[in-house]
């Protein structure tokens, strides 16, 4: 079972066992082509999420009604792309195996590949 993050996305407070969605950060930017810094995105997204409107006109409900668990950021080694993608894939696989939906925040675009690999193997 994953541990709860202290600073959560939009203040989500579900327990892991009850959550349908599990958020995790992948702070990685080793292959960016212009300016590094996307590794700080997951922390910035969480910090700014407290100011978001909770009502979704698309869902016609409060986003706080969704059962979300924030498992925090992975510790990813700068410069080791292969290991970073493997770690992201492992986290996504754990979440999928537990019957939950992974919600990845990054990081550069490449971090998506790890989660996609896990989903392809499952489905």
Language model region names:
Residues 1-123:
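Metal-dependent C-N hydrolase catalytic cores
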């Amino acid at each position: 079972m994953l541990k709860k993050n202290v600073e959560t996305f939009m203040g989500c407070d579900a327990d892991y066992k009850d959550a349908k969605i599990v958020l995790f950060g992948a702070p990685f930017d080793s292959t960016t082509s212009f300016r590094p810094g996307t590794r700080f995105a997951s922390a910035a997204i969480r910090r700014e999420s407290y100011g978001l409107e909770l009502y979704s006109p698309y869902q016609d409900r409060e986003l706080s009604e969704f059962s979300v668990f924030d498992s925090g950021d992975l510790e990813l080694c700068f410069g080791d792309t292969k290991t970073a993608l493997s770690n992201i894939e492992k986290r996504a696989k754990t979440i999928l195996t537990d019957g939950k939906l992974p919600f990845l925040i990054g990081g550069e675009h490449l971090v998506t590949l790890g989660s996609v690999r896990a989903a392809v193997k499952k489905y």
